[in-house]
Amino acid sequence: VPATTADVQPDAPDIAPPSPGYPGARRPDRSRWVQANGLRLAAYEWGDPDGPVIFMAHGGFDFAGTYDQLAPRLADAGWRCVSWDARGHGSSQHAPLYSWTADERDALAVLDTITDEPVVFLGHSKGGGLMLDMAHAVPHRLTHLVNLDGLPSRNAWPDLAERERTAMLHSELTAWLDHRRRIASAERPPGTIAELAARRARMNPRLDAAWLEYVVPIGATEHPDGWRWNIDPSLRFGGF
């Protein structure tokens, strides 16, 4: 992962609790903006600022607020839990480019604002895959790795023939450019909190409806015609 620069900004992302709440869920104790790689990323913390750090990456199409149940429990056990909204997610800025490498650079930029000491890496789904790659790229920055249903990177395997890697890259780039053209003027359809929760439930029917209605006001914005998820419509899993 290339070296990055980060600058913590003085104002802070919103951490007001939604209404109604959800049993066991708690909004972060602190929040801040991190200027990283040309983007403003929203970072959040639960727990004692002097406690040992768990660095937490959320899943694809999620945001740091989806840790509002897990992080408080870890914080109450003495940990300092730190997460952030990935580029194009939650309160972080949208970007002209999304890639696995860009996510790694952003993660390292946020980590650099926390501590130089090794910490625990924790990631869920795509975030688990991201933390796997981070552990390989910067092994001196972690003590332990917790992978919750993590996905592997979509980078080409090193033992593939060069012509196969080239063909894969051509196919991926073509599909990505076609996708960008299709969504150039796209806008996420508005809805009520219940409607957005129902859409998210289709991605994972096991999730409690009340929990989904709790996270909508955290990861979405209310407009005159209804609520819309803050996630950039141009996003695709794995960057490309």
Name the predicted role of every residue range.
Residues 42-93:
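Conserved HGGG/HGGXW glycine-rich cap/lid loop of the alpha/beta-hydrolase fold
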Residues 68, 108, 132-136:
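Short, hydrophobic alpha-helix immediately C-terminal to the catalytic nucleophile
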Residues 34-39, 76, 86-122, 126, ...:
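Active-site loop/oxyanion-hole signature of alpha/beta-hydrolase fold enzymes
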Residues 117-163:
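Conserved hydrolase catalytic core segment
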Residues 148-188:
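A catalytic-pocket lid/entrance helix-loop region that shapes and gates access to the active site
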Residues 1-54, 76-79, 116-117, 152-153:
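Alpha/beta-hydrolase fold catalytic core
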Residues 187-240:
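Alpha/beta-hydrolase
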